[in-house]
């Protein structure tokens, strides 16, 4: 009976995150209405309040502030949740948790996971062009596509920490109390995909979530999945500055080969390094 309870409890973190996002949204809307409606009216009596509010609510900075506030609140809540409820250890013993071979493996996995995610996104977009249009529109309005200090802060640092605490920490630990690792990993990855609220990103996030869950569980530390997630997002953020290789057959073959080699070598090194760690050590 307890396992059934834990199974349904696994959905609570996702619901809590949605609530936090709503709170952050209403907080920023309230601040915007106060700033533009009350203070703005005093400073600029002739200004049209509704136009100023519309401009504020649709601005990139406004959207980014919502995400940053949400991320900071989520990191605090889920960090305490995991520490208190699941005895999380955020200061693990380096000798018992980290192995140089595993750290190198995380870096090697980055191009493979990025290329695989892009392939999944492109294939999904080819099958459903309407999903691709929605995905592109979402990114354009969110401001994530603009490479600024704020977007890098959120995308590369805050988002990976936030999402790993939600899904590979709290959600995974809860699911593990009801299911074997393989099913628990699929469940947290599915919730991770659902969290993104669009088909394109949700499908490749599901695949990425499986890899992150495996790395976290087998590595015995949330820092492995955080590191991979951070580097994955960093690659995506900086990819706009990479030269365009074109769409030739040669480029396609090279990308496929790099993807396969990256994933195979990365996982082999990771598991080889894991076997060198003390038995049953954990730094999650």
Positions of the model-derived regions?
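Alpha-helical transmembrane segments
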Residues: 6-21, 104-113
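Membrane-interface segments at the starts/ends of alpha-helical transmembrane spans
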Residues: 7-10, 45-66, 140-145, 244-251
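Hydrophobic core of alpha-helical transmembrane segments in multi-pass integral membrane proteins
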Residues: 71-81, 108-114, 253-272
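Juxtamembrane helix-loop-helix connectors linking adjacent transmembrane helices
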Residues: 42, 55-57, 88-159, 280-284
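Membrane-interface capping segments at transmembrane-helix boundaries
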Residues: 83-89, 267-282
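Functionally important transmembrane alpha-helices
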Residues: 18-27, 189, 200-256
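Alpha-helical transmembrane segments in multi-pass membrane proteins
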Residues: 18-85
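Function-critical hydrophobic alpha-helical transmembrane segments in multi-pass membrane proteins
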Residues: 112-117, 137-199
């Amino acid at each position: 009976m307890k396992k059934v309870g834990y199974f349904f409890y696994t959905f609570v973190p996702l619901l809590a995150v949605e609530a936090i996002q709503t709170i952050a949204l209403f907080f920023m809307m309230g601040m915007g209405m106060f700033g533009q409606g009350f203070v703005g009216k005093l400073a600029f009596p002739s200004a049209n309040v509704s136009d100023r509010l519309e401009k504020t609510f649709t601005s990139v900075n406004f959207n980014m502030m919502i995400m940053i506030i949400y991320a900071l609140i989520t990191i605090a809540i889920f960090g305490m949740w995991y520490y208190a409820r699941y005895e999380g250890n955020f200061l693990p013993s380096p000798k018992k948790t980290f192995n140089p071979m595993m750290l190198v493996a995380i870096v090697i996995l980055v191009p493979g996971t990025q290329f695989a995610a892009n392939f999944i996104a492109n294939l999904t977009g080819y099958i459903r062009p309407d999903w691709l249009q929605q995905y592109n529109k979402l990114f354009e309005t969110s401001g994530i596509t603009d490479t600024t200090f704020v977007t890098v802060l959120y995308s590369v640092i805050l988002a990976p920490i936030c999402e790993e605490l939600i899904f590979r920490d709290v959600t995974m630990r809860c699911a593990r109390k009801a299911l074997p690792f393989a099913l628990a990993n699929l469940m947290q990855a599915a919730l991770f995909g659902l969290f993104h609220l669009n088909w394109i990103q949700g499908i490749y996030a599901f695949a990425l979530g499986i890899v992150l869950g495996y790395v976290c569980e087998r590595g015995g530390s949330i820092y492995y999945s955080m590191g991979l997630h951070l580097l994955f997002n960093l690659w995506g953020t900086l990819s706009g500055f990479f030269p365009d290789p074109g769409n030739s057959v040669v480029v396609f073959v090279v990308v496929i080969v790099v993807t396969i080699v990256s994933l195979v070598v990365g996982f082999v090194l990771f598991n080889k390094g894991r076997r060198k760690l003390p038995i049953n050590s954990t730094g999650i």
